[in-house]
């Protein structure tokens, strides 16, 4: 699963927000995630890790997670370019149509 697909899931976006500013243990992420099971949180963390959105660091028995801001920012930059190009084309088409309607 790529980063875009991984972030399509609302709980994963919530988890990413939790680990954006600081490293957190899996248990802390679970407690902050509301009514979701620890197993589900672990699955979401695995998907986010495999997609490159978060990094995991082992500290003894603890597993610490932190957002990979560089990877997420690269995705955002790609999306901005994509939407910018499409919006520019839409603007051009709209202006042409408006011009044709004036004639």
Located regions from the model:
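Coiled-coil-like amphipathic alpha-helices with heptad-repeat character
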Residues: 6-8, 58, 81
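N-terminal helix-turn-helix DNA-binding core of bacterial DNA-binding proteins
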Residues: 1-6, 10-37, 62-73
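Amphipathic alpha-helical dimerization/coiled-coil segments
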Residues: 17, 21, 73-103
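Short, hydrophobic-biased segments on the C-terminal half of alpha helices
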Residues: 45-46
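Beta-hairpin "wing" of winged helix-turn-helix
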Residues: 49-60, 64-66
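Alpha-helical interaction segments
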Residues: 54-56, 71-74
